[in-house]
Regions:
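Short, basic, alpha-helical segments at the C-terminal edge of helix-turn-helix-like DNA-binding modules
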Residues: 67-72
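Secondary-structure edge/capping motif, primarily at the C-terminal ends of alpha-helices
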Residues: 112-115, 173-176
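Short loop-to-helix capping motifs
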Residues: 57, 114-119
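Amphipathic alpha-helical packing segments from all-alpha helical-bundle domains
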Residues: 74, 100-103, 119-146, 157-160, ...
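Hydrophobic alpha-helical connector segments
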Residues: 64, 75-105, 155-162, 183-186, ...
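Helix-turn-helix
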Residues: 18, 22-60, 64
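C-terminal peripheral helix-coil segments that are non-catalytic and often amphipathic
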Residues: 1-3, 85-96, 133-134, 138-142, ...
Length: 202
């Protein structure tokens, strides 16, 4: 029985995934400053020039890596309508994902931390953080509209606070994993935001 030949797009997708995984591994092992297109290509088992062919520049690679490692951080939310329920599921799922701290999650948090002092990352993560806050603001606005969130909740303030809390917990998990009980924390933090935001129902 012959194995079906992969299409050109399938080969391209496989190569890009391998390159992004290699880039994430290098970030985790040696830091973002070690990242070059040539090293990523070699680490992935391809030629030194393949990463350049796919991404064009180191900056474009970092942009793609940031997007790829953030996507799917909390699975199961695609298609969920915005509102209090989605917000609480996001918080619970984010902290739960930190309990496993898989390679993409670890790489994303390390890149995010580096963005404070690395100019080539700062613009990328301003955009990623704003996209995250925008989703959170949508949840707050939808919850106020449907009567599940208090009308005096300020969407911008809540979005900033939730993002800061989740990323802060993530960095603590990176630095001192035993000190962060994610299973207990996911329940307490989700419960806190439910109490802080939910409009009491009659």
């Amino acid at each position: 029985m012959t194995t079906p030949r992969r299409t050109q797009q399938q080969r391209r997708d496989q190569a890009e995934t391998a390159l992004l995984n290699a880039a994430a591994e290098l970030v985790i092992e040696e830091g973002v400053h070690s990242l070059t297109l040539a090293r990523v290509g070699e680490r992935a088992g391809y030629s030194r020039g393949l990463a350049t062919h796919y991404f064009g520049s180191r900056q474009a690679l970092l942009q793609r890596l940031a997007h790829a490692t953030q996507s799917g951080f909390v699975p199961g939310l695609d298609g969920a309508p915005p509102g209090l329920s989605r917000l609480l599921r996001l918080i619970d799922g984010y902290i739960g994902a930190l309990g496993q701290l898989r390679m993409p999650n670890r790489a994303f948090l390390l890149l995010w931390a580096e963005a404070a002092t690395a100019a080539d990352l700062a613009a990328i993560f301003r955009e990623r953080d704003e996209a995250f806050r925008s989703d959170l603001r949508q949840d707050i606005a939808a919850g106020i509209t449907d009567g599940t969130i208090r009308p005096d909740a300020t969407a911008e303030d809540v979005a900033v606070a939730v993002l800061a809390q989740l990323r802060g917990i993530g960095l603590q998990r990176l630095v001192d994993s035993p000190a962060v009980d994610t299973e207990r924390l996911r329940r307490s933090v989700t419960g806190y935001w439910h109490r802080a935001l939910a409009l009491p129902q009659p």
